[in-house]
Amino acid sequence: MAKYTEEELLQLKPTYDVAVNFDVDAFKAMIAEVAEHHEIADLFHQKARRRSSHHHGVKPKIKAHKPRITTDDDGWCTSTRKTSVVAVGDDGEPSPAFVAQETLRVKPNNKNIASSRPADTRDIVADKPTMSFNAFAALESDDEDQF
């Protein structure tokens, strides 16, 4: 920004006068009203904050329930866990929980197979024995004992 001396500022002063019908008091009141409006807006303005990286979902609350500890007359403490909810029959015995039978289908991942022929699911499921090289067995050969 350019700095001016007092003489230069007096030379740059406008030579014409303010209009006769200009109301200075109304102009000052309007400036005060705008300044007050800006102060109120700044009071309620939330400044730009860094966005949080964990706003995608609510973090699950993992709370392990403590077991209930009961003390006997002899001073022995035993802990009892909360029993799971199982349907109880007429005789008071819990009925066995039924497990739904599901069939498991293996879907081959053809994009990692170099052949143009699609993979057979029987080949994927079957585990084939592999021959592996044992380095320690190779080091312990009978030829070294002869020397």
From Swiss-Prot:
A single BP term in Gene Ontology: filamentous growth
Alphabetical list of InterPro entries matching this protein: Caf20
Main location: cytoplasm
GO molecular function: eukaryotic initiation factor 4E binding; translation initiation factor activity
Region annotated Disordered, chain positions: 46-76
UniProt-annotated location(s): Cytoplasm
Compositional bias of kind Basic residues: 46-68
Positions of disulphide bridges: none
GO cellular component: cytoplasm
UniProt cross-references to Pfam families, sorted A to Z: CAF20
Name of protein: Cap-associated protein CAF20
Organism per entry: Eremothecium gossypii (strain ATCC 10895 / CBS 109.51 / FGSC 9923 / NRRL Y-1056)
Gene from which the chain derives: CAF20
